[in-house]
Each structure stands twice: as structure tokens, then as C-alpha cells.
Design a protein with these regions (language model features):
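Short SAM/SAH-binding signature in class I
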Residues: 88-94
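Residues immediately flanking
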Residues: 80, 95, 133
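Short glycine/proline-enriched coil/turn segments at helix->beta-strand junctions
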Residues: 85-88, 123-124
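Conserved Class I SAM-dependent methyltransferase catalytic core
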Residues: 42-46, 50-59, 99-165
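Conserved S-adenosyl-L-methionine
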Residues: 1-85, 100, 104-106
Length: 165
């Protein structure tokens, strides 16, 4: 949405400010028309995604259907280890974590595999990975560029940036 200059609240039918006493429908229409005129097309292939869960892929595709040029975003059901090289990309990942999965089994192995994928197939990229549990950050095996605390529900997680060389 940001790349395409799609205004926030584009799917809303009504805003609270429309009930204010000095609200002007003419001014609002002018602002809305100007914002809509600044929308630009999303080139095919600029954004893509994947997940191993069919439900997640289906939800992403459904959400994209209502978005301007959402059909230019490819979402596939596949394991990240099977993806082709993502050199000089921006990678955003919200991988599984123990609390969300209900189990800590094999997560250390998973995060090591994620780190190996980033090192081997993502040269020149920046990766932003959300960790619901901080103890797995070191399992990736890459030096962090920075870590930012992010609360998601009861999770005291971290968004971590990796610069892959």
C-alpha cells in the first residue's frame, strides 16, 4: 500500500470526522480525489510471499484481492528452503515460534535453517525477522544490525534486522 500511495482507510465507507460540525463534503471530496489520483501501479513481481500453511496463503490472497493491483503480488505455498535466490531483496519474515505453535520442538533447527537460507541464497539483502521468543535470535547464526522490542498480544518479541553480505 505504501509503494502504491494507497491512502490509509481506503476501504472505509465513513470516517468519524464526517460528523464534525464544520465538516465540508466538498473539501473532503477534493482531498479524496487528489489522494486517489496519486495512486500508482504496483509492478508485477515487486512483492511476493510464501508460507507452508495453505490457510495462511489463502488468507493472504483473499486480502490482496481487494487491493489496487493486488493481483501483481504473488503468494505461493512453499517452504522457504525451496525458494530460489533472493539477492538484493528486502525480506520480511514472521516465522513460527513456540508459544504460537504450542511447542518448542525443533525450533532451534528451524532457525538455524532460516539463517543458512539467508546466508546462502540472500546475499546483498536486508532481512527483518520477528521473534516471538528472544532465545531463538542467536540460533539464526547471523550478526544482528539492530533489535527493536515489539509487543504482540502477550508476546514480548523482537523485530531483528540482518544485513546479509
Amino acid at each position: 500500500m505504501r509503494y502504491s500511495n494507497i491512502p490509509a482507510g481506503v476501504f472505509r465507507n465513513r470516517f468519524g470526522f464526517e460528523s464534525l460540525p464544520d465538516f465540508s463534503r466538498a473539501v473532503w471530496q477534493q482531498v479524496k480525489t487528489e489522494a486517489d489520483g496519486n495512486i500508482r501501479n504496483l509492478p508485477p513481481g515487486l512483492i511476493g510471499g510464501s508460507d507452508v500453511a495453505a490457510e495462511a496463503v489463502s488468507a493472504a490472497r483473499t486480502n490482496l484481492m481487494g487491493l489496487h493491483n493486488g493481483n501483481n503480488v504473488s503468494v505461493e505455498r512453499t517452504d522457504f528452503k525451496k525458494l530460489s535466490a533472493l539477492k538484493e531483496h528486502v525480506i520480511v519474515a514472521n516465522p513460527p515460534y513456540g508459544i504460537r505453535m504450542g511447542s518448542d520442538e525443533n525450533l532451534a533447527v528451524f532457525y538455524k535453517a532460516l539463517g543458512d537460507f539467508l546466508k546462502q541464497k540472500c546475499k546483498g539483502s536486508a532481512a527483518f525477522v520477528y521473534f516471538g521468543e528472544r532465545q531463538y535470535i542467536k540460533k539464526v547464526g547471523l550478526k544482528t544490525a539492530w533489535k527493536k522490542p515489539i509487543k504482540a498480544g502477550r508476546l514480548d518479541g523482537r523485530l531483528v534486522k540482518y544485513e546479509i553480505y
